């Protein structure tokens, strides 16, 4: 469908791409990944035709249509209702509907057979264009990504940039282009809408290319990963988790081959140096020189993801009770957020505050920080030192400061070397650290504000969407730091992987009350799934930490269960056989006579890629059957 062939693209002499190639098939679901600044968004613009390659070509099939969601759409404005904007996806049907309305209006005053014939043709065309269902489809998508029925008739201009992006996403999904390109689509979505979009994209009848730093989203949608690295496009036939495993294996094989080849070269060079002056050894010396020259050199693996870790430091631990909220109420006019609710944060609590947008998560964070007026009592504990990161913190940056200078003035007591290392963690290179705050993009300013918060000596952190402008490497650094953090924190985030790694408690707002689940996000999700499965009419008791139930003997078997159990057994045999073949293939590839010959190694690597792809599909089906069996067994208990 789209062929990207040997493209090169340069910015000021720096090669973003150099002889890079990839192919997009009609049903591909591709995750485009790589460090920030490597050219992921640029590639989407090149494919879209918004930018031109310096060398090479990007060719598209004649009937290929492209829809592109990028951050530039944040500025799109319209006085039309959001339902009207979304229905712009059905342009032909909308235009036909207007023509029908004009003819119906004419027929009220002047009847003619020609008008009736034209009306009939237009109505047939309208039906062919699914015109009678277009409004229902638009409503379904808009409500799926978080809009209420009342919202649908409000003008687009009344919504914030993030909500406008949702409308543009809905319009693109409804247009159903051959290729859907989405640049950071989850940045403006909440958890329920992210899950809805995942389900939609999984069954999308077309190709999808996604740039995202949400690994759960990628794992749940994509079937192919393309990494932008060292000016190249490297493909992996699986989702993000598959990519991580496969890349590590490829790099281990390549590094072993490199080291073995270098050892052979050094041995040959020593022989040449030792015997080059001896006439009796001239033939052997020349033979070794030719052998070195004929070698197709294996490149050393370059770890371009290496990063500095950092740890939080504070001198004074807080008291046992960090913040206590009693009989708290908060409303904006008629919009009630909280009503007579209570909550306590204790030392060591690592809380993820989750839920749909508009429920009051950011409001609650400001209440906890003391920056939002509220009815009721907020009591801060003994010796609590607070650090607060949110979007409004960007306004507190000194725009004439350089980035490094801004951190120095934060008074953390850290050395310049430590500060430079921390800035490196948050994607600022040595040269970038001397840029003025006023020339930075919104995302860069967010990272500076986050770094300032994290270098403080706070023993209580409040973080509002801290991963929004981070890549995978920086996110991992932040995860490790928060895991080791000895203080307490509350984090608002829609990044499921992030919160699954850092939180020991989950907060959510329901019926204007702060609800607490005393466990990890994965345990919370398990509890929620059990609640959904329950057919009990009475409301569930207050959530408690639950452990996965011990397996129970099945009381009775039925044909469906027996069929699934048989398929499961067959799958397990296939998985075991594939794993044995994988092990044997890896052992073959590790032999010197194989990895020293790059063409042979490459052929084995292709076999391994196919095997890993098949194994991935077997494992996915195995998981599906296990879930089906669990559901069937639950019904018989």
Question: Where does each model-flagged region fall?
Answer:
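Intracellular alpha-helical coupling/juxtamembrane segments of multi-pass membrane proteins
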Residues: 246-301
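ABC ATP-binding cassette signature C-motif
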Residues: 1-258, 307, 311-637
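Active-site phosphate-binding and catalytic loops of NTP-dependent enzymes
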Residues: 152, 280, 299-304, 376
């Amino acid at each position: 469908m789209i062929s990207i062939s040997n493209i090169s693209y340069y910015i000021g002499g720096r090669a973003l791409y150099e002889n890079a190639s990839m192919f997009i098939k009609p049903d591909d679901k591709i995750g485009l990944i790589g460090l920030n600044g490597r050219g992921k968004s640029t590639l989407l613009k090149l494919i879209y035709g918004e930018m031109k390659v310096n060398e090479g070509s990007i060719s598209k099939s004649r009937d290929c249509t492209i829809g592109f969601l990028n951050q530039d759409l944040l500025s799109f404005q319209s006085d039309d209702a959001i339902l009207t904007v979304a229905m712009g996806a059905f342009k032909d049907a909308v235009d036909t509907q207007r023509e029908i309305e004009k003819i119906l209006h004419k027929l009220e005053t002047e009847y003619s057979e020609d008008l009736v014939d034209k009306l009939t043709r237009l109505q047939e065309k309208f039906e062919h264009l699914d015109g009678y269902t277009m409004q229902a489809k638009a409503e379904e998508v808009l409500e799926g990504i978080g809009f209420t029925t009342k919202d649908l008739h409000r003008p687009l201009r009344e919504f914030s940039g993030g909500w406008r992006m949702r409308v543009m996403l809905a319009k693109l999904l409804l247009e159903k282009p051959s290729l859907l390109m989405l640049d950071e689509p989850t940045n403006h979505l909440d958890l329920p809408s992210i899950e809805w979009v995942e389900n939609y994209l999984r069954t999308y009848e077309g190709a999808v290319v996604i740039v995202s730093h949400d690994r759960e989203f990628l794992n749940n949608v994509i079937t192919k990963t393309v990494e932008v690295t060292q000016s190249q496009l490297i493909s992996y036939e699986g989702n993000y988790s598959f990519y991580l495993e496969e890349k590590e294996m490829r790099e281990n094989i390549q590094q072993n081959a490199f080291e073995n080849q270098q050892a052979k070269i050094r041995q040959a060079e020593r022989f040449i140096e030792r015997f080059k002056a001896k006439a009796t050894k001239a033939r052997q010396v020349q033979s070794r020189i030719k052998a070195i020259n004929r070698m197709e050199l294996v490149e050393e693996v370059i770890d371009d993801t290496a990063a500095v870790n950092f740890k939080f430091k504070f001198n004074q631990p807080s008291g046992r009770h960090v913040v206590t909220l009693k009989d708290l109420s908060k409303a904006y006019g008629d919009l009630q957020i909280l009503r007579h609710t209570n909550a306590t944060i204790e030392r060591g609590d690592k809380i993820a505050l989750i839920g749909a947008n508009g429920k009051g998560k950011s409001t609650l964070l400001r209440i906890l920080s003391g920056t939002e007026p509220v009815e009721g009592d907020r009591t801060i504990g003994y010796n609590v030192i607070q650090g607060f990161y949110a979007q409004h913190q960007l306004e507190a940056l000194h725009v004439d400061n350089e980035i490094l200078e801004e951190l120095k003035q934060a008074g953390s007591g850290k050395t310049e070397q430590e500060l430079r290392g921390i800035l490196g963690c948050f994607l600022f290179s040595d040269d970038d650290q001397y840029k003025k705050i006023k020339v930075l993009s919104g995302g860069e300013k967010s990272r500076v504000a986050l770094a300032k918060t994290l270098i403080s000596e706070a023993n209580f952190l409040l973080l509002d969407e801290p991963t929004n402008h981070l890549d995978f490497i920086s996110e991992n650094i932040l995860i490790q730091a928060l895991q080791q953090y000895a203080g307490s924190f509350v984090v608002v985030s829609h990044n499921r992987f992030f919160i699954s790694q850092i939180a020991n408690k989950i907060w959510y707002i329901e019926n204007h009350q702060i609800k607490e689940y005393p466990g990890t996000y994965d345990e919370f999700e398990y509890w929620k799934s059990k609640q959904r499965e329950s057919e009990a009419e009475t409301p569930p008791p207050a959530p408690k930490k639950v452990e996965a139930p011990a397996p129970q003997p099945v009381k009775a078997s039925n044909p469906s269960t027996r069929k699934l159990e048989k398929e499961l057994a067959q799958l397990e045999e296939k998985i075991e056989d594939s794993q044995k073949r994988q092990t044997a293939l890896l052992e073959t590839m590790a032999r010197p006579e194989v990895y020293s010959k790059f063409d042979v190694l490459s052929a084995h690597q292709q076999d391994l890629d196919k095997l890993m792809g098949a194994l991935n599909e077997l494992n996915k089906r195995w998981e599906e059957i296990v879930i089906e069996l669990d559901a069937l067994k639950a019904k018989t208990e």
